[in-house]
A protein has these predicted regions:
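PAPS-dependent sulfotransferases, especially Golgi type II membrane carbohydrate sulfotransferases
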Residues: 1-2, 121, 153-156, 184-242
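Short, well-ordered alpha-helix to beta-strand connector turns
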Residues: 21, 77-78
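Short, basic, helix/turn surface patches
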Residues: 52-60, 137-141, 218-225
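PAPS-dependent sulfotransferase catalytic core
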Residues: 1-67, 201, 205
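Pocket-edge structural micro-motifs
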Residues: 28, 83-84, 230
Length: 242
């Protein structure tokens, strides 16, 4: 099971809520997708000659397939929700379909682009970002927004039941019904969640990203008011992409 979509859309909050269920493991940003991709590039690239010469190509394929099992080897929950914004990219979905029998299911979080940009600008300002806090945020195929944006666009036009799209405001304002939709989509037995005592069981070290507070959540659900003014150029760009 995957958790993907745009950044600043409540993925940490959603993971914390789902993790209240002992049968669900949902942690922070996962390396599984990147590890599988890198191994695939090796098996069908730099290591191909050796694998074929020694009749070990099947071994290489097994290595790719077993990366999720190794990554989550200490997890006892029956369902793992792997969080990575790259799961909506076509090559990564093709990789899931190639190596696993079951049809992949991916939760895709969305939010108006202008709100995402405001959130990142506020985060940069809080971390004393040196330079223009709007700099590079909407550059073509850039991280962390535009690469994810392209993935979400692709998922929307190629959805054959693999993707469940979730709006940020629905997660905040219609939490119970949104969680119920997720359980139905994932074909999981229902669970009574506590939306007034939310704890992040798997906190990330935001120093690695250079953005302290990036994955902070509060024990109750509410939308933070941001006193952020964007430039006219940025507002226009957000509107043109929406």
């Amino acid at each position: 099971m995957g958790l993907s979509g745009l950044p600043r859309t409540g993925s940490t909050l959603l993971s914390a809520i789902l993790s209240q269920n002992p049968e669900i493991h949902a942690e922070g940003n996962s390396a599984v997708c990147q590890l599988m991709w890198d191994m695939q590039c090796s098996v069908y690239g730099t290591a191909t000659q050796q694998l074929i010469a020694s009749d070990r190509l099947d071994t290489g394929i097994e290595l790719i397939k077993n990366i999720p099992n190794i990554y989550y080897k200490d997890v006892t929950a029956s369902t793992v929700i792997d969080k990575c914004r790259s799961w909506t990219l076509p090559d990564n979905m093709a990789m899931l379909n190639k190596y696993f029998e079951h049809k992949p299911k991916v939760l895709v979080l969305e939010r108006p682009l202008i709100e995402i940009v405001r959130s990142f600008v506020a985060l940069r300002q809080a971390n004393n970002y040196k330079g223009d806090p709007e700099e590079g945020l909407l550059d073509t195929w850039s991280e962390p927004i535009m690469r994810s944006y392209e993935g979400v666009k692709w998922a929307k036009t190629n959805n054959n039941g693999e993707f469940l799209f979730i709006q940020y405001d629905d997660l905040l304002n219609n939490t119970k019904s949104t969680i119920n939709k997720i359980y139905e989509f994932c074909e999981l037995e229902s669970f009574e969640h506590d939306f007034n005592n939310i704890v992040n069981k798997h906190p990330e070290n935001d120093e690695v990203y250079g953005m302290l507070g990036q994955h902070d959540i509060r024990p109750t659900i509410n939308k933070r008011d941001l006193d952020v003014k964007l430039s006219k150029e940025m507002i226009a760009k957000c509107k043109s992409l929406s």
